[in-house]
């Protein structure tokens, strides 16, 4: 990398001395592009040399193995060890060849990514820079076109690297891969104060996860509302049972039987004592005749029936007794509307999610 930078320095100095109208940012961008292109060319040359040497060795080993297989049987016993060693070498070289092909594919992918990033940097710089003259405008409107110099033709001889020594040839491809430079704070534009290009990745699974979470919350809410309604119905049932249960005094009266002087006839004393006890316990009704008491009881029964008719749910037809408060009856009626609102809300949320997903797919 340093050698390539040293080679490109005279070119950059000559371009700056020629009196061009490029801004400092465009000069830095051009310098970075030249450095990247020179690095890619040198790497391709090294890989081509290594592939050629491996092919030559493979060819030599194939010829040697074919000669050893075509020899007479008299010499087979003496050269068995050599044949086995040659076959082992052939298999090892084949493995190395496959490894090199994988590394070549990796480097080509890295070069493609590097080229896209450099083209994006050039486009951003051209959009941000203000045109100073017509020449600068024409230069900014030009798109970065990929050259076929080092793919179809031999590279420039003035830019070639010197021949490597035998010790340097044994370097692995991992030492020259671009992945080693990925841990730095900035990528290629770091030494030249260029902006780092951020890769925007779409996350289509985010909408699916959000929809799943909303569905789960809706199910939990629906279950909680259902449990609340069941608890309220149980509470109303208990209230009705408590209201219908007689008071302890009335229960004692029904249990207590009148005294019998004879097994068949009741005594007047027992009846009079019962009436006195009843009148002493119900002091509020001492001055009212029995007919008036019967009328009051009938009116209460009619009022309870009217209240029961008034407390009939218009949605499900459930009836509530007079002992149930009006607030409980109102909450039961409101529950029907809350359930309908929840269903509408869930349907609208699902429609919005599908609409969001369709827009996201269309924009992509």
From Swiss-Prot:
PROSITE patterns: ZF_UBZ1 (PS51905). It is found in: Cytoplasm, Cytoskeleton; Cytoplasm; Cell projection, Axon; Cell projection, Dendrite. GO terms for cellular component: axon; cytoplasm; cytoskeleton; dendrite; Golgi apparatus; perikaryon. GO terms for molecular function: zinc ion binding. The modification Phosphoserine is found at residues 53, 85, 172, 202, 264, 270, 325, 349. Phosphorylated by IKKepsilon. Phosphorylation is required for spn-F neuronal distribution and dendrite pruning and reduces spn-F homooligomerization. It does not lead to spn-F degradation. Disruption phenotype: Mutant females produce a ventralized eggshell. A fraction of eggs are fertilized and the resulting embryos have a variety of pattern abnormalities. In mutant ovaries, grk RNA is mislocalized during mid-oogenesis and grk protein levels are reduced. Defects in microtubule organization around the oocyte nucleus. Bristles are considerably shorter and thicker than normal and have an altered morphology and growth direction. Actin bundles are poorly oriented in mutant bristles. One of its GO terms (biological process) is oocyte axis specification. Zn(2+) binds at residues 313, 316, 332, 336. Residues 9-26 have a biased composition (Low complexity). Residues 32-114, 210-243 form a coiled coil. Changing residue 270 to A: Abolishes phosphorylation but does not affect interaction with IKKepsilon. Keywords: Cell projection, Coiled coil, Cytoplasm, Cytoskeleton, Differentiation, Metal-binding, Neurogenesis, Oogenesis, Phosphoprotein, Zinc, Zinc-finger. In pupal bristles, localizes to the bristle tip throughout the elongation period (at protein level). Pfam families: Zn-C2H2_12. This is Protein spindle-F. It comes from Drosophila melanogaster.
